[in-house]
């Protein structure tokens, strides 16, 4: 086995592509590496098309093996399970730029599998997987119009950084992944810390320029190791059938696309399809229903696109830059912490915000170790939202992808843990859908967070843009419908505040989208975003001053870190008793910060008082109230200051002679005691002599446990 290797510099990193030694029964296989992060990518393509196949069955799977990071999986089975959310998102990242590069009419099944086999914690495997998939598809000989390149762009100290390391990403104001061919950008996925439209576009152009080195080296790699190109020819169009369908359907489809209401329009289109199929199959039984539907779909595209290019009104009668009618309601669910319904035309999202404590944070088990996520965003797309029946269950890839995009849009305005010590979860339920439900989720989330009293930095709105391009003519569309998304050449989603962009996602189906066109789209999107923000600000101009009565209130106090073990107790006994007895939730940080969450303010204050007792220092000669915990022959043990036990010797109970301790004291009895001595082993000696229940007792709070105005914040 003599592997063929291609190595090249890519920014600050070295990329290695290797083929010919592993997985030789696959159509193509590439071991792609970037500075010790290695992803093994295979492509298997079927030479024959399944009978009746009428779509392109491309599957992309991305999987991370824990051995790549020198770890053994957790859990009972000790092996990797179903794909995580992160793996699903990276699979989509690979799929989106390669799918449009297969020719129309190519229906052969292809599976791409990317497996992470080694990981350098400083190099994210997603970019390596994209480069490996591009190389493997290019080597395979399938009719793939690539290769593509991929680049990650950061923005640090007002400078763009190519493929920043994990450490650099933490201080970057931008995380943008761009993929494309040598001629055109195909995909952008990004989140930003409120950057301008010009900065975002410059980042896209920068990434596309820098990735050309990847494309050139893959082309050279293919010359050396590529398989012969498949002798595939697109099927000849059935001109006679096309003319028959046109004669029966074209005028009727044109009329149908003047119906503005989606369901009524779809019913009319379905009726036309059924009628045309019935007529043509009656004339010739060999005619394929699938072929007729494909021709009708092409007619729909031609009619809608032609009208847009000609400057005619859109499907629902709008001009190119008009946003659909908006309707906003906040506080719609009485017992939730924050809620809103955002409606844009026939797209509607019910967004709900929930506040939780530190223990509600999501622990994510990644290759490089565990991390905690304090902001959760879940997007649900039930079948009723489009008037259909369907399966309800675990989220599909699309729901995971849309949820992550919406989360990216809102993340930049979320408060820090110091500013707002809550874990926040937002759920967006799509109740109606006709285009851009992910951007409706961004708007709904912003409204629900403000309704919940989350001090977000600014309101965020999202808008989906579209494009229709015919030769040199093009039209950019604001707030696209589902049909315009399906029949157009670009899906371009922008989320942001009045000050700038927080998320940008772009999927382009054709070549020839220039930076100038992208600039027009971004500027048009900005105008639409400002309009939506104006309407949102009328509904709720700022976050609520107070959180919901049904949300937990977090009280913060500071204790000496050395006292943390006392508050937790042996095996967690003390803290468990505190939470169970008061119905509160207690979290303690390593620096001694104690966070108490409770819906009952009195319960929180009671817990704080008990913690103050626990951490307070016992002072010699101080007098305390205590409770008898044990009675023995030689005296009684009394608990003071939240659990510190001291001994009252039989001789110290009273000035009289005591024969039996039980004659004077019983378990649970409250007594007043004075500290006589604390010995070297921290044992406390107490006395009850000359004391009674009216004797003034010491304050139970010492300097270490005092809660100052700076240390305590009642949220």
From Swiss-Prot:
Its EC number is 2.7.7.8. It holds the Pfam family S1. One of its GO terms (cellular component) is cytosol. Signal peptide: none annotated. Its cofactor is Mg(2+). This is Polyribonucleotide nucleotidyltransferase. Mg(2+) binds at residues 485, 491. SMART domains: KH (SM00322), S1 (SM00316). HAMAP family: PNPase. It is found in: Cytoplasm. InterPro entries: ExoRNase_PH_dom1, ExoRNase_PH_dom2, ExoRNase_PH_dom2_sf, KH_dom, KH_dom_type_1, KH_dom_type_1_sf, NA-bd_OB-fold, PNPase. Component of the RNA degradosome, which is a multiprotein complex involved in RNA processing and mRNA degradation. The keyword Magnesium applies. Involved in mRNA degradation. Catalyzes the phosphorolysis of single-stranded polyribonucleotides processively in the 3'- to 5'-direction. The keyword Magnesium applies. NCBIfam families: polynuc_phos, PRK11824.1. GO terms for molecular function: 3'-5'-RNA exonuclease activity; magnesium ion binding; polyribonucleotide nucleotidyltransferase activity; RNA binding. GO terms for biological process: mRNA catabolic process; RNA processing. Residues 552-611 form the KH domain. Belongs to the polyribonucleotide nucleotidyltransferase family. Residues 695-715 are annotated as: Disordered. The lineage of its organism: Bacteria, Pseudomonadati, Pseudomonadota, Gammaproteobacteria, Pasteurellales. It catalyses: RNA(n+1) + phosphate = RNA(n) + a ribonucleoside 5'-diphosphate. Residues 621-689 form the S1 motif domain. The gene is pnp. Keywords: Cytoplasm, Magnesium, Metal-binding, Nucleotidyltransferase, RNA-binding, Transferase. It comes from Actinobacillus pleuropneumoniae serotype 5b (strain L20).
């Amino acid at each position: 086995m003599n592997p063929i290797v291609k190595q090249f510099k890519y920014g600050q990193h070295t990329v290695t592509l290797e083929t010919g030694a592993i997985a030789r029964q696959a159509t193509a296989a590439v071991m792609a590496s970037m500075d010790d992060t290695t992803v093994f990518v295979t492509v298997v393509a079927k030479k024959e098309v399944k009978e009746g196949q009428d779509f392109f069955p491309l599957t992309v799977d991305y999987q991370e093996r824990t051995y790549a990071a020198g770890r053994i999986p957790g859990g009972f089975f000790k092996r990797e399970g179903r794909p995580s959310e992160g793996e699903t998102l990276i699979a989509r990242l690979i799929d989106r730029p390669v799918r449009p590069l297969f020719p129309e009419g190519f229906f052969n099944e292809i599976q791409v599998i990317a497996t992470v086999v080694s990981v350098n914690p400083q190099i994210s495997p997603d970019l390596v997987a994209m480069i490996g998939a591009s190389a493997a598809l290019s080597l395979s000989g399938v009719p793939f119009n690539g290769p593509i390149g991929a680049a990650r762009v950061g923005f640090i100290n007002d400078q763009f950084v190519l493929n920043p390391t994990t450490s650099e990403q933490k201080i970057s104001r931008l995380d943008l992944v761009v993929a494309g061919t040598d001629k055109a950008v195909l995909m952008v996925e990004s989140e930003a810390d409120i950057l301008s439209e010009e900065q975002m576009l410059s980042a896209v152009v920068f990434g596309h320029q820098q990735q050309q080195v990847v494309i050139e080296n893959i082309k050279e790699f293919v010359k050396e190791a590529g398989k012969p190109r498949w002798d595939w020819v697109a099927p000849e169009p059935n001109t006679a059938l096309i003319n028959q369908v046109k004669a029966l359907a074209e005028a009727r489809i044109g009329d149908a696309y003047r119906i503005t209401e989606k369901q009524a329009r779809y019913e009319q289109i379905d009726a036309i399809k059924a009628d045309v199929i019935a007529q043509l199959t009656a004339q010739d039984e060999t005619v394929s229903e699938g072929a007729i539907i494909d021709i009708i779909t092409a007619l729909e595209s031609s009619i809608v696109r032609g009208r847009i290019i000609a400057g005619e009104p859109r499907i629902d009668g709008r001009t190119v830059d008009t946003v659909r009618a908006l309707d906003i309601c906040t506080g719609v669910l009485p017992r939730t912490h924050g809620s809103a319904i955002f409606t844009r035309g026939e797209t509607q999202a019910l967004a709900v915000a929930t506040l939780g404590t530190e223990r509600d944070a999501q622990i994510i088990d990644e290759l490089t170790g565990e991390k905690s996520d304090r902001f959760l965003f879940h997007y649900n797309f039930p079948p009723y939202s489009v008037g259909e029946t369907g399966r309800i269950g675990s989220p599909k890839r699309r729901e995971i992808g849309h949820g992550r995009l919406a989360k990216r849009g809102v993340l930049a305005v979320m408060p820090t843990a110091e500013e707002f010590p809550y874990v926040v979860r937002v759920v967006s339920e799509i109740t109606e859908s006709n285009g851009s439900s992910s951007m409706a989720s961004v708007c709904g989330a912003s409204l629900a967070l403000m309704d919940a009293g989350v001090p977000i930095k600014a309101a965020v709105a999202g808008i989906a843009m579209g494009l229709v391009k015919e030769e040199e003519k093009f039209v950019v569309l604001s707030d696209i419908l589902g049909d315009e998304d399906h029949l157009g050449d670009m899906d371009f989603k922008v989320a942001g505040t009045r000050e700038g962009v927080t998320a940008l996602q772009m999927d382009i189906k054709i070549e020839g989208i220039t930076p100038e066109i992208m600039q027009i789209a971004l500027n048009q999107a900005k105008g639409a975003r400002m309009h939506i923000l104006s309407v949102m600000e009328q509904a709720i101009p700022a976050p609520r001053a107070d959180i919901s009565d049904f949300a937990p209130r977090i009280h913060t106090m500071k204790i000496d870190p050395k006292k943390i073990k006392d508050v937790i107790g042996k095996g967690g006994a003390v803290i468990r008793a505190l939470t169970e007895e008061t119905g509160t939730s207690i979290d303690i940080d390593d620096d001694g910060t104690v966070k108490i969450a409770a819906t009952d303010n009195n319960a929180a204050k009671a817990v704080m008082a008990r913690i103050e007792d626990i951490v307070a220092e016992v002072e010699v000669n101080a007098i305390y109230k205590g409770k008898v915990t044990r009675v023995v022959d030689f005296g009684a043990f009394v608990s003071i200051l939240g659990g510190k036990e001291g001994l009252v010797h039989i001789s110290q109970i009273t000035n009289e002679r005591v024969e039996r301790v039980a004659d004077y004291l019983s378990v649970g009895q409250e007594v007043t005691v004075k500290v006589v001595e604390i010995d070297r082993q921290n044992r406390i000696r107490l006395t009850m002599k000359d004391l009674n229940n009216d004797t003034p007792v010491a304050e139970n709070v010492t300097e270490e446990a005092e809660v100052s105005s700076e240390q305590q914040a009642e949220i």
